């Protein structure tokens, strides 16, 4: 009897942990904080100590409600270090109310209106001969490629970003942490 009960408990645990036979890796921590698949992009981003500049910019741009929405969204999320690498004074200037339109343009160049995991990006790039062009919510065109097993993103200004943490699943999409702010044509 005890053996049958143990088997039943083991089976129930196995099914709940593998979602009917398909197992998923746990979300990686980002900025020292756990990321919950049941929370939306904003609910998770505010917990990352590496994304305080991004969160402040999203708030200043009035994009919180959008990124809390249903989605799905893929967000290429630049770190604080990525913003700090911009020319001196750029972030402070962009956060001024009179520069909101430019801030919105830059931030929405980091958002794709679809859920694209890194495996999807790899497959699309391979199918397109090595580089896949994607349109962002902000009207930018990003060139996605894979180099040495890492997803690379070329922005319209010619800058290159590397995905440093991929596939952070959200309730409304996915975040890929990047090491460079993606810029539109200026």
Model-derived features: positions:
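Mature, structured domains of secreted/extracytosolic soluble proteins
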Residues: 23-186
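Bacterial N-terminal signal peptides that target proteins for export
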Residues: 1-10
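C-terminal segment of classical bacterial N-terminal signal peptides
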Residues: 15-24
């Amino acid at each position: 009897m005890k053996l049958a009960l143990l088997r039943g408990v083991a089976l129930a645990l196995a099914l709940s942990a593998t979602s009917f036979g398909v197992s998923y890796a746990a979300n990686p921590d980002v900025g020292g904080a756990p990321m919950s698949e049941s929370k939306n992009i904003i609910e998770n981003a505010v917990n990352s100590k590496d994304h305080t500049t991004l969160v402040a910019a999203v708030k200043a741009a009035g994009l919180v409600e959008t990124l809390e929405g249903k989605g799905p969204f893929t967000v290429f999320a630049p770190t604080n270090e990525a913003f700090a690498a911009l020319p001196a004074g750029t972030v402070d200037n962009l956060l001024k109310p009179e520069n909101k339109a430019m801030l919105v343009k830059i931030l929405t160049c980091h958002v794709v209106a679809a859920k694209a995991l890194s495996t999807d990006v790899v497959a699309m790039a391979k199918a397109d001969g090595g580089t896949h062009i994607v349109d962002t919510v902000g009207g930018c065109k990003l060139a996605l490629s894979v180099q040495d097993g890492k997803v690379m993103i070329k922005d319209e200004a010619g800058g290159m970003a590397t995905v440093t943490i991929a596939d952070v699943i959200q309730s409304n999409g996915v975040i890929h942490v990047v090491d460079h702010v993606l810029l539109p044509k200026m």
